[in-house]
Amino acid sequence: ALGHERFDHRLVFYLVHFDFDTEAKKKLLHDLRHAGSVSLSFAPAVLFLRDGTPEDIQFNVELGFDDIINVPLDGRAIATRLAAQIGREHLYIETRHYLGPDRHRLDTPGQTQRKALEEHAQLTILRTPEAGVQIVRRQVVGKKQ
């Protein structure tokens, strides 16, 4: 679905232009997360927004982007944000209907905590240039009452 017959790259980024409409973004993320390759399914998907509001950012986090970068932003800041996807652990959530970064990561302390509606897996992933994408831990979590 993503146009990759044979895929040998260890570390891939998907950089998404701000002109993608919502349906195109949903399709891209669905196809990416269900690509059948760990290198693709857990590749960082980074959306560039033009002067996005906090609501725009939250909406796109909920869609499943790993990061949202507002442009214009200087090149050094963009490089720092992209580098943050490499060499550190990231929490991904896997449910029957979603695979992607933890959508609760922007919840603020004191904010009403959302509850898991179904059993899901928490996957800790690590991306490095040397090893590509690795699933470091997988923990099944029951739904909260």
Which ranges hold each PLM region?
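Hydrophobic/aromatic residues positioned on beta-strands within the core alpha/beta folds
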Residues: 47-49
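Flexible loop/N-cap segments at domain edges
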Residues: 57, 77, 143-145
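Alpha4 helix (beta4-alpha4-beta5 surface) of REC/receiver domains from two-component response regulators
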Residues: 26-27, 51-67
